[in-house]
Design a protein with these regions (language model features):
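Single conserved hydrophobic/aromatic residue that forms the stacking wall/gate
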Residues: 1-8, 12
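A basic- and aromatic-enriched beta-loop-alpha substructure that forms the phosphate/nucleotide-
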Residues: 28-40
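A short, hydrophobic beta-strand/beta-hairpin element that forms part of a small beta-sheet core
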Residues: 13-19
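Residue-level signal for nonpolar/aromatic packing positions in well-ordered secondary structure
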Residues: 31, 100, 119, 156-162
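GST superfamily/GST-like fold recognition
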Residues: 67-72, 110-139, 144-151, 155-156, ...
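Surface-exposed helix-capping loop/turn segments at secondary-structure junctions
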Residues: 41, 102-114, 160-165
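Acidic/histidine-enriched, glycine/proline-rich intrinsically disordered or flexible terminal extensions
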Residues: 169-190
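Conserved C-terminal alpha-helical bundle
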Residues: 36-37, 47-107, 128-135
Length: 190
């Protein structure tokens, strides 16, 4: 294992438990599952809904980082613009938005009416894609056509905890609307 890579990776070291040594959890999907189980929140108790939740969580883990990052790199950041990778990644991003849009046309959230860790994991990239014109690509991706994804993302973005979370470590905007580091709930007014 590469120790330098591990030093940059997000992880949880849970010392609140009686386990010795402390429990270590890394990778965002594993961290979400661990926290959901530990705090009994955002994780369906029903076996069928839990399977649906895990399926969507793994769908996001396996797709958004690669496709979103690939699209962003070739569309916005690559030193040279090549049509093939831009079109290939854009096609896949649009295919995923279409999958989400069709699913959300019959569901409030990814697991029906229940907000879960699948939504928590999926919202940041796909929500930013349809609501915040990331990479200045909204028109290119035709994000306005994904009306159910837009509705879902707006509902999630309006959640008080999401509003607070969007302030943490945000490098732009008036200083009074930002929280540069998150240490405790007292960092926030509400």
């Amino acid at each position: 294992h590469n120790d330098a890579r591990r030093q940059r990776q997000m992880c949880i070291r849970d010392r609140d438990r009686s386990a010795t040594p402390p429990i270590r959890v890394f990778e965002s999907g594993a961290m979400l599952i661990y926290l959901a189980e530990k705090f009994d929140a955002f994780y369906p108790k029903d076996a069928a809904l839990r399977a649906e939740c895990l399926s969507w969580l793994m769908w996001q883990m396996g797709s958004a980082p690669y496709l979103g990052g690939g699209f962003g790199h070739f569309y916005a950041y690559a030193p040279e613009k090549f049509e093939y990778p831009i079109d290939r990644f854009a096609m896949e991003v649009k295919r995923q938005l279409d999958v989400l849009d069709k699913h959300l046309s019959n569901n409030n959230y990814l697991c029906g009416n229940e907000y879960t860790i699948a939504d928590i994991a999926t919202y940041p990239w796909y929500g930013a894609c349809v609501l915040h014109n990331i990479y200045s690509a909204a028109e290119f991706l035709d994000v306005e056509s994904y009306t159910h994804v837009i509705r879902w993302a707006k509902e999630i973005e309006a959640r008080p905890a999401v509003e607070r979370g969007r302030r943490v470590n945000r490098p732009w905007g008036p200083e009074e609307t930002r929280v540069l580091e998150r240490h405790s709930a007292s960092d926030f007014d509400n």
